[in-house]
């Protein structure tokens, strides 16, 4: 028997989703301060696991720490239905070559795990 795909959770509220996307864009742009501010907003407005993961990322002492914590946060966000125009992307080199997902706007890769060093590394896996 084949496994049925898990039911997607409803879309995140706009304020939470927008704060996540702001943090993803800030990481892709190599901005620790902007990423931290967006994650603080996500932690303040969120609840449960999303709040815990966002706060852990916001509390990181440097951009590498935020990027490491962003992996689990992105997995949590990816469990929800995505608004139209957003995609789930994957970089095979992130997370010490174990790979990592993230949600982003559009289908032009904007890698939050490597920023300008490898901004376009990855592929869209779901739109």
Please provide the spans of the model-predicted regions.
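Intrinsically disordered, low-complexity terminal tails/loops enriched in metal-binding residues
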Residues: 1-127
């Amino acid at each position: 028997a084949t496994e049925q795909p898990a039911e997607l959770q409803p879309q995140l509220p706009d304020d939470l989703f927008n704060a996540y996307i702001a943090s993803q864009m800030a990481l892709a742009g190599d901005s620790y301060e902007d990423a931290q501010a967006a994650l603080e907003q996500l932690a303040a407005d969120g609840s449960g696991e999303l709040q815990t993961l966002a706060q852990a990322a916001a509390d990181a002492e440097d951009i590498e720490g935020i990027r490491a914590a962003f992996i689990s946060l992105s997995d949590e966000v990816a469990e929800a239905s995505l608004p139209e125009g957003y995609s789930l992307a994957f970089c095979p080199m992130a997370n010490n070559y174990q790979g990592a997902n993230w949600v982003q706007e559009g289908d032009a890769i904007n890698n939050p795990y490597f920023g300008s060093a490898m901004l376009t590394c990855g592929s869209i896996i779901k739109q």
